[in-house]
Amino acid sequence: ATPHCGILRFTFPSNEQSRIQIDLARRVGGTSTVQYVKVVNENTIQGWMKCTPDGGGWGNGEGSADYTVYYYAQFSKPLSNYGFWSADIPDNWVRKRDEVVSIPYLTRVSQTPVITGKKELEGKHLGFFTEFPTTEGEEVEMKVGISFVDMEGAANNFKKEIASKNFDQVRQEANDLWNKELSRVQISGGTDEEKTVFY
């Protein structure tokens, strides 16, 4: 990761229909309450997720943060076969940490029909997927820039921090940054295992 971006690398088997799917509603400790996603070009999506206390969040699902996170995401494989879903989660259902992994909740999500033929969608409990053929061991990367200000900020962060980098470069730079910051701290005592846990 970088300060405002992240990169994921997926390794696939040989398959005519490999898939990456993103649950745009999920967040730490619960769900975002409304989402928007738009296909920008053959490799890119952008959008936002509104996160209110109603959807849970930090603090064991009892968080009180209220924010919108904007994203700009690019796939290394073209979005030639993609779609969306919009799960029918009743408004009176609790959307906090334990509930979003419950059987009734997951059942509703799994039974959601796929939506194709659109370039953008706004709603509650949205998801996005892209499918593509892969060869044995093929690596596919997804890079994402975020902003808590606007979509332009997410795209700018993406371009500035991660657009020209690959997974290994980003991982090495993140490792170097952590080592630089953690080298400021000197610890004494404890076992080697405890020092490793501290690090």
Spans of features found by a protein language model:
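Beta-sandwich/jelly-roll carbohydrate-recognition scaffolds of carbohydrate-active enzymes
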Residues: 1-199
